[in-house]
Amino acid sequence: MKYLMYLCLKELKINKLTMKRQMIITLALALTMTMPTFAKKAMTKKEIAEKEKAFKNLQHPWKGKKVAYFGDSITDPNIKASKVKYWGFLEEWLGITPYVYGVSGRQWNDIPRQADKLKKEHGDNFDAILIFMGTNDYNNGVPIGDWYTETFDSVRVARHKPSEMVLRRHRHFAMDKNTLKGRINIAMSKLKQMYPTKQIVVMTPVHRAYFASSDKNIQPDEMYENARGLFFDEYVKAIKEVGNVWAVPVIDLNSLSGLFPIYDAGAQMFNKMDTDRLHPNDAGHARMAKTVMQQLSALPCNF
């Protein structure tokens, strides 16, 4: 019995020593990790003042720039659904000079015309282009199409041996004016060659719901397929792909803006609850503008 008590006391003593040793090691590691903090010299008042000044001098990279806006009715200054458009808020908040070319009802095939008008009126004297287009391509049942066509062509290659001619698949941009992707290719090809050094930003169309301006212009909400049997999100998806196909930033307003007129609760951001859930009102445009402003803060306006 005494022997058993002796063994228990001995084991307890060993456990206490082990715990003590672990605590010492842990404390030593903690001190080692915090030593650089203790050793770091505190900033002087002058250094603090300089950092505060630098922080105050930070400004939005698009502040005071000249920006061209291509688009449809949501960009068109003549549409009365809102007194101030998203580009008007950006002008107010960032001092951006807007060159607006959006026209109601236009589709992606109108971008080349808008680009020509910009060139004629301002030449190269601007900083960037924002494109906000696509909702009318959906409404008019434009086929989605393909980004590329393919051929089999001979090309010379050399890889660790003398060069030789081989037959390989060869992609070409599909320039079909009757499809969405073809129209985008035509537009972006023109812009990339016309303005190779300019920042070009594409924005996805926002969600859309019921619109009726007359007996001859009634547009169901996006939960219905269009005349082509395609849903709205298929057009949005294609426009999002432009970023990788043409090396341009894409601002996904369809998701980021939060505008959702499908439900009555979201219709307050649009022109008329009963007849126009297609065009955002002032509140809707302000929300879009805030989203665009934040997204643009991460992008250079000039190169």
Q: What are these regions, as identified by a protein language model?
A:
Residues 40-104, 109-125, 129, 264-265:
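Serine-esterase "nucleophile elbow" of acetyl-processing enzymes
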Residues 2-3, 15-22:
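Positively charged n-region of N-terminal signal peptides that target proteins for export
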Residues 4-9:
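Short hydrophobic targeting helices and cationic amphipathic motifs
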Residues 35-39:
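Sec/Tat signal peptide C-region and signal peptidase I cleavage site
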Residues 93, 115-303:
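Alpha-helical cap/lid subdomain in secreted, periplasmic
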Residues 26-34:
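Bacterial N-terminal signal peptides
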Residues 26, 62-63, 270-272:
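Short hydrophobic "helix-edge" motifs at membrane interfaces and signal-peptide entry regions
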